[in-house]
Amino acid sequence: EMLKGIAEGAKETRSPAIVSVSEGAFAYTDENFVKGLYESARKSYKDVPLFLHLDHGKSFEMCKKAVDLNFDSVMIDGSALPFEENVLVTKKVVDYAHAHGVLVEAELGVLRGIEDNVSAEKNVYTNPESAEEFVRRTGCDTLAVAIGTSHGAYKFSGEATLRFDILSEIEKRLPNYPLVLHGASSVPQKYVEVINKFGGEVTGAKGVDENLLKKACREHNIFKINTDTDLRLAYISTVRKHLAKNPNNIDLRKFNTLAIEEIKNLVADKNRCFNNINRI
């Protein structure tokens, strides 16, 4: 359902899409199912460039598995490791992935919050000088940076702010280098309200202001923005509302069709917000 909604949204705005698969997704199903689902989507949406990406690979072995499955790109997340260990594991992944024509995203700095297999209690902002050294020594193709975003639906207790001063300093040291923002869901309140109204409990959920995200991708070198939480909220709010109003329904296709449509609309809106339209 998620994949179909993403592909439909990308088709509507004539945009390429990066479809991220987490270690949790591999644990939930299996590698053959993941690969088969993606290959089927590419056949069904031949006019939409869909790129398969491993999100938050925690080890060389996990990244190697994704490379061997012909993923287009992998992320090695050594952000919780000491700097030198992060460099070593990232360089090992880069060497293997590049030999197979696969791009590598790495991460430096720590994002607070919980999402899938990623958990941290506080933010550790990316050090610009360390970022420059890290990219030079590892040869990673993109770098996820920590400038104030966080994983999950509860990103800010007060005013939502991002450290654009840190981002600008990183860009001075890495001119024209593609950077990534994780934990950048805006947590639309319309979804939060529907979930809470129909039996859920996500009170206090708060995301990143979309105006800040617009600035990040339109005025800075942020080329990839991760918004998984928003997709989850779109799906869950639609399903909860439908089942509450149709308690006798046992046909999954009825509420999944509605959820796919909502995901499609959300993805299309994100593409417009991030100026990712008419690119194919």
What are these regions, as identified by a protein language model?
Residues 180-183:
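Generic long, charged, amphipathic alpha-helical segments
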